[in-house]
Amino acid sequence: MKYTVTIRGKLREKQAAAKKYHDDVTGATKDAAKKAGDLTHVVYLDPQDPQAFFGIDTWSSLEGLQAFAGSPQIREFFGKLFEGDPEVHVWVDSDWNKW
């Protein structure tokens, strides 16, 4: 089973500074995330609100996701990247029609 995680939040800094911080941290943690089961990581930005952030990750392991996301380093990362707590939701695939 795959788990899709959505993260919606307000960036604490302007986009350029937030991107640098995000890319530095995710670059440094990519191997650990992949080892824990993170298959994909994608960020979307709102063209009408430069502080809006929407991320989608796909995980192969719920246990790996929970361990990685609950680590002090990732909690610190979220605290520095976002104003307040972002909305984080875990979703599972359905057998509904797709295209």
Predicted segments — roles?
Residues 1-70, 84-99:
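Short S/T/G/P-rich N-terminal loop/turn motif that feeds into the first structured element of a domain
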Residues 29-30, 75-77:
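A common structural junction motif
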Residues 78-83:
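Short, conserved catalytic or adaptor-binding loops enriched in Gly and charged residues
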